[in-house]
Structure formats: structure tokens, C-alpha cells
Amino acid sequence: MQRKIHGQMSESFLIAGILSISGGLQDAYTYMYRGKVFANAQTGNIVLLAQNLVDRNWQAVLRYFSPLLSFALGVAMAECIRMKYQKAQKIHWRQLVLAIEILLLFAVGFLPNEIDLLANAMVSFACAMQVQAFRKVNGYAFASTMCIGNLRSGMEA
């Protein structure tokens, strides 16, 4: 018996679960091993950035500003990919986003801790591309790297 797939595979609960786990692991990795910076939780980075601005800790300001900027650039890159490849026949634009994300995250694994700034920027860039590319589950709004909105939406449904 064959199963019929309805809608986009990218909107399935399975993909949403995998991406959510991935997003959580990326945040845990950058926070625990790359200088206490959040890859996904940009609100946390904004709070820490503001605290370090007040304390005039300029090195830490850069540490928290870099992922914010990279996140914004990652959203823009995902949109550029969507616009350019949305009608492509051989590969879906979201597959291209995932391929870039995988390559970036693989490369980060080889970066030494002396360049955590670059590593965090790359992870935040990849996270932003994921957030921008995978925005729905079965037609409902979804953020694959943030839990609070998903928990609220899930309880509401």
C-alpha cells in the first residue's frame, strides 16, 4: 500500500521535529562551547549585548553583535535563494538552503576556539536560513529554532 503525500514535505511534523532538535542543539553548542553566545535565541543576544554596552565591555559587545548581524544576513540569503530557485525543477530551494546549512555547520566543527566569533556568526547565519525557509507545519506558522511560540501555538491548536 502506498502512502499519498499531501502538501509540502517541508511542512511535515517529521521535518519540523528534526529541525527543532537541530535548532536546539545549535543553540546549546554555541552557548556551551563557543563563548556563551546564542545561535538562535537572538533576544538573549540582544539582552547580553545591552548589558555589555552599559558595562562598556566592547569585546563582548562585538561577540553578541556578530551573531545578530549574521542572523539578519542569513534571513536575506534564504530569501535570495527562494526568489532565484523557487521555480527550479531539479532541486527545491529549501533543499539548497539545507545543503548550505549542513556545509556551514560541518565547517564550524573544524574551527578552533580562538575564532569563536566566526564560528558563532556562521552558526547564526545557518540558523537564520533555516528559520526563514521552514516557516510552516501543515499550514500553521512555525519557528524551527525557537520554542516559546511553538509551545503556545501547539497548546492553542
PLM regions: where:
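Substrate-agnostic recognition of the 12-TM MFS/MFS-like secondary transporter fold
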Residues: 44-50, 123-157
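Helix-to-loop junctions at the C-terminal end of transmembrane segments
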Residues: 75-90
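Alpha-helical transmembrane segments of multi-pass membrane proteins
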Residues: 20-38
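C-terminal ends and interior cores of transmembrane alpha-helices
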Residues: 99-116
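Cytoplasmic-side transmembrane-helix entry/capping segments in multi-pass membrane proteins
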Residues: 90-99, 120-122, 143-147
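Short, Lys/Arg-rich, polar N-terminal cytosolic tail immediately upstream
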Residues: 1-12
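Interfacial helix-start motif at the membrane-water boundary
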Residues: 51-68
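Alpha-helical transmembrane segments in multi-pass membrane proteins
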Residues: 15-23, 66, 70-74, 78, ...
